[in-house]
Structure formats: C-alpha cells, structure tokens
C-alpha cells in the first residue's frame, strides 16, 4: 500500500440495490488493500456492517484523506457542500443518470480507483457560492452551492421584479421568472438549460442567467468571481425563494435582500489521470465530435 491516501471515507445515499452493491464492493476491496476506511452512517446501516468505523459527513471530512462518493451528481453535490469545508479530496463513482461530476465507471471503478490511490490523478479546486438572505434587524439565513443559486417564485410560477447590484453598484433590473447565478461547475447544469454559457472549471467567473425574461434584450452576464451580487425586490410581490443546487431552499421575506458571493473555501475534486473536461462534454452532453 502506498502513502498517497491512508484513510478513505465511503459516502452516498443509495436509492437502488445496484448502488448499495457498489458501496459494499468498495468497502471490502479497500479493507483488503489495507486502508483505514470510514463509512457514512446511513450506508453502514443499509449494509448491516458491524464493528466498523462510521461517521457523519463532517466527521469523514475531518478524519479522512479521500472521500469516495457513490451515486449520481445529486449525491455528489449534497456531499460536496459539506466536505468542501475540510481539507479532503473527493472523487465519485457514477451510479446515477448523467454523472458529470462522478468520473469513475462502476464497471471499472476498482482499477480506476487503484490508479488514483497510487497517485495517478488530476486535482482541481472548484469554488462554491455562498448565499445569504438578510435584513438589517434580522438574523441571516445562509447556505452554499456547488452548481448554482437560483431565484424563483416560492410555489406558483409568476413574474418577479428585482434589481441586481454588483459590488454595490446598480447593474440592471429585470422582470422575469427568476435568475440563475452559476459557478463554472454549474455552467453545464441548470444554467446550460436556460441558455447560459459553458465555463471551463478553472475560470474565476460567475454567470447570471435570466429565466424567461420579459424583454428581448436580456442576456446572460459573466462577471469576476470576486464580485458580490445583491438582489433587491419590489415590495409588491408574492413569496420568493432562493435554492442552492436544487436541494436547499431559503425563503425571502418582505424587506430582505439576497447576497451572493464566492465562498472562502473550495472543493478539492480529483479525477483519473486520463480525465479530459472536453471529452466529458462530448460523452455526457453530446458536444460536437471531431471531424478528422
């Protein structure tokens, strides 16, 4: 056994028996290789593992060198928002539909993971967004996002009137169904479906993509990731929310603003040595093929 990674966490929320089988196979293989393994508590319960080290996501982040997330992109996003707070590397085995963030093929996962554990991997730092719903005399409500923060109506779809300030300078106003504020990681997710640009992961940029704007002149905007975005709203409005990675929703009350900025920490995402972002675009999203 090498010394690139000593303690490995197994993470995920299995929805299908095949995913649970992958968790069990991974656990037994890592133990046979001599690694210290920490299993997320829910997985250990599902597998009926006895007398094995278990932990929460936070405990895995504190104790392990590498977290292996088994599942789809949703599982990866949910785990990564917590794991990013810690100095831990993260890689994924795809057991979902698209698997844009989960690189390892479940049929060849052990061989690919073996190469990674021997130090043959590519490391990337992916920044997160922090979203705050705030008012002067109220406590802030805060969440984070790997992909995007989305402004949208709370229950029934309707048009929203709002203003956007960038670094406290008025940028534009809009009447639309909402706004997608995306990281480069999220530029191939919801933002892409709304007509936003694809940003390569290394770019220090944030995109603002309108959702069904009531004007022909509204276009996506790309700004520096060091900028702070403030959203202000008309007082005459129905319930609004912001959602983070389509997994966490924060309600917006009357008189409250939304502040969105880059997080102070980042996700350490690793890939197999032969990983290519543009190849992933081609295979996962049907990006155009080579002509010759």
Swiss-Prot record:
Active site per the UniProt annotation:
73
Q: Which cofactor does it need?
A: a divalent metal cation
Protein's name according to its UniProt entry: NAD kinase
What Gene Ontology terms for biological process does this UniProt record contain?
NAD metabolic process; NADP biosynthetic process
Which InterPro entries does UniProt cross-reference here? ATP-NAD_kinase_N (IPR017438), ATP-NAD_kinase_PpnK-typ_C (IPR017437), NAD/diacylglycerol_kinase_sf (IPR016064), NADK (IPR002504)
Enzyme nomenclature, EC number: 2.7.1.23
Principal subcellular localisation of the protein? cytoplasm
According to its UniProt record, which reaction does this protein catalyse?
NAD(+) + ATP = ADP + NADP(+) + H(+)
Q: What class of enzyme is it?
A: transferase
Q: Which family does it belong to?
A: Belongs to the NAD kinase family.
Q: What does this protein do?
A: Involved in the regulation of the intracellular balance of NAD and NADP, and is a key enzyme in the biosynthesis of NADP. Catalyzes specifically the phosphorylation on 2'-hydroxyl of the adenosine moiety of NAD to yield NADP.
Record: residues binding NAD(+)? 73-74, 147-148, 158, 175, 177, 188-193, 247
Its gene?
nadK
Q: What Pfam family is a match, any one?
A: NAD_kinase
Q: Which UniProt keywords apply?
A: ATP-binding, Cytoplasm, Kinase, NAD, NADP, Nucleotide-binding, Transferase
Q: Which GO terms describe its molecular function?
A: ATP binding; metal ion binding; NAD binding; NAD+ kinase activity
Locations listed in the record: Cytoplasm
């Amino acid at each position: 056994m090498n010394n690139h990674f000593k303690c490995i966490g197994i993470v995920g929320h299995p929805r299908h028996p095949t995913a649970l089988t992958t968790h069990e196979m991974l656990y037994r293989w890592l133990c046979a290789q001599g690694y210290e393994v920490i299993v997320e508590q829910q997985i250990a319960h599902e597998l009926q593992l006895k007398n094995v080290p278990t932990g929460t996501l936070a405990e895995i982040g504190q104790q392990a060198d590498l977290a292996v997330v088994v599942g789809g992109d949703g599982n990866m996003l949910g785990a990564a928002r917590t794991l990013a707070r810690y100095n831990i590397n993260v890689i994924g085995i795809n057991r979902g539909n698209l698997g844009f963030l989960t690189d390892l093929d479940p049929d060849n996962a052990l061989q690919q993971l073996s190469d990674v554990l021997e130090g043959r991997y590519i490391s990337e730092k992916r920044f997160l967004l922090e979203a705050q719903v705030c008012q002067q005399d109220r406590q802030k409500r805060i969440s984070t996002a790997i992909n995007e923060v989305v402004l949208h109506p709370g229950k029934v779809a309707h048009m929203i009137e709002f203003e956007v300030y960038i670094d406290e300078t008025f940028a534009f106003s809009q009447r639309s169904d909402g706004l997608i504020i995306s990281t480069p990681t999220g530029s191939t997710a919801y933002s892409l479906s709304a007509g936003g640009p694809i940003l390569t992961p290394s770019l220090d940029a944030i995109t603002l993509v309108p959702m069904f704007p009531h004007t022909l002149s509204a276009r996506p905007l790309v700004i520096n990731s060091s900028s702070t975005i403030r959203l202000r709203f008309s007082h005459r409005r129905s319930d609004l929310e912001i959602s983070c990675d389509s997994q966490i929703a924060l309600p917006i009350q009357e008189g409250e603003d939304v502040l969105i900025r880059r997080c102070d920490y980042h996700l350490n995402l690793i890939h197999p040595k032969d990983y290519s972002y543009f190849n992933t675009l081609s295979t996962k999203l049907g990006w155009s093929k080579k002509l010759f």
